[in-house]
Amino acid sequence: MSDTIPILKRIDTMKAKKVIAMLLVATLSVTAFTGCTINKNATVATLDKEDIKLGLVNFMIRYQEAGYDDMYIQYMGEGYWDKTVSGNNTVLETWKKNAIEEAHELYTLKAHQSDYDVAVSDDEKKEIEKAAKKFMKANSDDVIDEMSATQEIVEEYLKLRLIKSKMYAAIIKNADSSVTDEEANMAAYTIVKLDYKGAYDSNYQYQTYTDEQSAQIKAQADAVVEALAGGSSLEDAAKAAGTTATTGTYATYVDPDVDKTDDSDKKSDDTESTESSESSDSKTKDSVYTTNNLDQSVVDALNSLEEGQTSDLITTDSTYYIVRLDKKTDEEATESNRKTVKGNKEDKYYNGILSGWQDDEKWSVKQKQLDKIKIHNYFTTTKKDAKAADTSATESTQQSESTNSTDTQNTEAVDGTEN
């Protein structure tokens, strides 16, 4: 079984103001500066006749790193970027792949601006220029060098993100994103889950149980079943057996357009309160729309129950489950899911338009140049500034609902002092 920690995905629909706020409202320090710089002007990819510079892609990667360092180091330790966390790829390899794909997307959208009458206004250009200057002035040479930041690179990235924000909004206006009650429906349940093959420890390493440990867990499951037969509630039965019952919601809609054999492009909308994703040994088929956090056998059992009914013991190849259907429709979760499904439809439409454009493009990547991007040290962000960045980004997003102009008034200087 692989030691897997989910890689955080970039937010594709981030508002332009939020982009700028998150870029600038944080205090960064870079540790152990190595002085290993790259050729910022080298071409790392080409879209038709436009060259994408290595410095921009490195900036995108190091900017992402700066946002994740504190959290990843806490869970994975220093040097986490060289650890394998997703299949056979390291964190850095995954970031490189994401960055080059994002660059492809951004430059494709830039090339099709005129299709949707999208442009960056003179006022927006001035605000972006001012924001980039402030960023360059506020940071130490070490931080600037590590991120391969230049006035031109920072401005280019902010312009590309602004164009994407505008293009996404323009494209999805043509999407059919209506959501039926059936599509939105979320049912509520209570569950007892007992893994009998093994579990992840505090270091995210999977530990296989001994036969004795597995037998003890089977005894727990049997004790829950026995207590239920005696009239106990699922909560009381779980407590008496030395475990807990937790609650959650799941989407009941079966999407006929989803390939049941491939869930790589699906998004999880389940909001189970304390349950984590199933291990790779689970029999998760994901044939129901957004059931990534529930084994298919659990979904099938829930769908067969009436409100208040409890299932028999469900056994998969790694886990015992007992579930109770609490509500066929959880109103609050359903309304929240309605927004999620709407967003999924908009994303699907947007991705379809984007893919169509990219199919007609000539896109090439110079892997040898991409391989030159290395990480030898990390950035740290103070708690105070991290909170300020989140607050400013939230405020900027709210403000951007009423205007397309960028906002840099609430930004703070970035400190590049070495630790």
Give the residues covered by each predicted segment:
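Bacterial N-terminal signal peptides that target proteins for export
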Residues: 12-22
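Hydrophobic helical h-region of N-terminal Sec-dependent signal peptides
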Residues: 24-29
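C-terminal motif of bacterial Sec signal peptides marking the signal peptidase cleavage site
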Residues: 31-35
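Peptidyl-prolyl cis-trans isomerase
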Residues: 219-294, 332
